[in-house]
Swiss-Prot record:
One of its GO terms (biological process) is positive regulation of transcription by RNA polymerase II. This is Protein STB3. Belongs to the STB3 family. Residues 230-244, 307-324 have a biased composition (Low complexity). It is found in: Cytoplasm. PANTHER family: PROTEIN STB3. The gene is STB3. Residues 296-306, 373-396, 409-418, 450-463, 470-479 have a biased composition (Polar residues). The modification Phosphoserine is found at residue 254.
Amino acid sequence: MSENQKEVSPPQAISVKSEASSSIFSKPISTSSPAGLAAAQRVTPGKLSTLLLEMGPLAIRHITQTLCLDIPCFKDLSSSKQRRLIMSAMESGDKEKSVVFEKIGWGQWSAKRVDPANFDKELEATNFANAKVKDLISQESQRRKSNNSNSNSGGKVEMPMKVEHNITNIDGATTPPTAVASTTIPVNIKRSKSPLAAANVVYIDENALASEDEDEEFDEDDHHLHYQNKSRNSSNNFGKSSNGDPYSFGRRRSQVVFADSTPENIEHEIIAQKIRPLLRNRRRSSIKPHTPFISKLNTHQDSSYLSPNTTSTTTPSNNNSNSNQAKIDLEKLTATSEPTSRRASRLSVSKESSIRSTLFPNKNYLIVTTNPNSKATSVSTSPKLEEQMNVSSNPIVLSDKEKHRVASQHLNGESSPQLVPHSHHQPHSDTDEEDWESIGAASLRNNSLAPNIDSVASSTNGVVSPKPTNPSFTNSQNGDIEPPLQHDQQKHEQQPRNGEDNSAAFLLMSLKS
């Protein structure tokens, strides 16, 4: 028995599957076939009016399911043919019972009794209203699709008041559970424009304004970090922005984009026009603090570099050669060579150190050269130097102790400084690290003057004070100017001498060599 059951069971399973597959993949019958014609003829307005008056309002799918149960072969028709048969019966109306079919939205239909005398007029008006609702629903379906793609937009479309009134008058007892669930479908759909949509039409480019604020901060830092390069053109282009500056405020404006000339756009444009002058004034006020900084930098330079009437004092020499061409002639520093002369002083303007006051030409020093062909010049234009130069006409006699000290300096190979401080009462010091008031003894105020012209002319190398002739010292004179010595060595600076003392010193130097 078990073997027979095993043999019979597979054919039974196969037959069940074949029936299921035939029912699933069954081809819908045509309306031209006898079964299709019989099913179509039984879909009448009277049958639909009876169904909707008893169970309405119903959706099309519920009406279709009820007709499939009542009419044989109706389920074998295609869904589109079923819908067309139902719609044609509703549009014709039930003239025998004076019932018209009204669409109340979203596929729900109801049956309404009318006056038999006005049946034709009511039927025409109802069909027109149904077509209107159909158009609204189709438009809503399209709007819902577009709303899914654009989540920022939303709105509200109101259905006719008549439809809402009909919904409220529906008897809940006659509505099946499926119809009650379908009545929860909203009739009003929100579809109005959001405030963000209007903001997208006209807007002020906030990115440009933010970048201008960043440029202002960067430009302020740029003035402090790179003012050395910018101050070169400050005398010619003061208060003007260069054309090549990528952070020029003159070319930056608020960008306003127009999409349509609606009243909202005009209102936004008026607001933008009121904002622009405030932004320009703000940018101008941010530039103003930089201009005193540039003018202060220009006034910080030495007066000898800014004034064309630069005075200098020279000492005559016997021979002229090309050995001193590498040195800067301070007599030629006029307004034409202003960029070259300003460059040395500008290099150290941000570093308050003694480099500027010792290496570069300064008004606190009197430059004395050791080459007979060179010139002893002064960059200062102070009246104290002129007074000292006027007093230097009288010869100065040294004591025996000072002569002995000078001779010992030559034997020991000590070198005298090149820069002699001549102004001991300066109103302002270039650096805070050096106190020029304490440099030098009180006697040097009267003795640190230019040497006698005869003694300088009679010397072999034009030395004001005795100096050794070693190669390292000569190379340092032809190269950079040496800084001043320490405070204790500056007490021995450049003692003027008469002709006999110079002769004795040079004799000792010749014996040493």
